[in-house]
């Protein structure tokens, strides 16, 4: 099977930067992101080869700890945060791809998903910034 026949879903992909190397290599990359696509109601195609998932990290990020004493910004809404995470996991399990990755900054999401298998900083891969990511 050629790369052009391999579907890569970029769930919550934003600008598509994460999936761009696959696009450059000729894969059929589909960026499933708002406002065009809502991952919570997205129905994936058949024969998905790989999935990159990057659900919103707002409710799980340790960076939000600095707002702990703010009357509104410090409150976490884990139910809302888990909506995208659950949608991504549903698509992953529905598609049963050859590979999949769910990315989120190191933080509180591990309470629901367990210990991460891999952590990194973007600078490990030549990017000019640090963001401890799992």
State where each predicted segment sits.
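A short beta-strand-loop structural module common to alpha/beta enzyme folds
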Residues: 21-40
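Short, well-ordered alpha-helices that flank and scaffold nucleotide-derived cofactor binding pockets
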Residues: 20, 24, 90-93
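Extreme N-terminal starter segment of soluble prokaryotic enzymes
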Residues: 3-8
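Class I S-adenosyl-L-methionine
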Residues: 11-12, 37-50, 57-134
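Glycine-rich SAM-binding Motif I of class I
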Residues: 16
């Amino acid at each position: 099977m050629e790369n052009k026949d391999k579907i890569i879903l970029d769930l919550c992909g934003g600008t598509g930067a994460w999936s761009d190397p696959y696009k450059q290599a000729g894969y059929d990359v589909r960026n499933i992101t708002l406002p065009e696509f809502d991952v919570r109601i997205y129905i994936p195609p058949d024969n998905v080869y790989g999935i990159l998932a990057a659900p919103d990290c707002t409710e799980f990020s340790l960076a939000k700890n600095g707002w702990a004493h703010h009357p509104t910004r410090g409150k976490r809404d884990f139910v809302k945060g888990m909506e995208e995470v659950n949608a991504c996991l549903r698509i992953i399990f529905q598609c049963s791809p050859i590979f999949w990755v769910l990315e989120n900054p190191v933080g509180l999401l591990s309470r629901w998903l367990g210990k991460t298998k891999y952590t990194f900083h973007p600078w490990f891969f030549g990017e000019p910034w640090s963001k401890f990511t799992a």
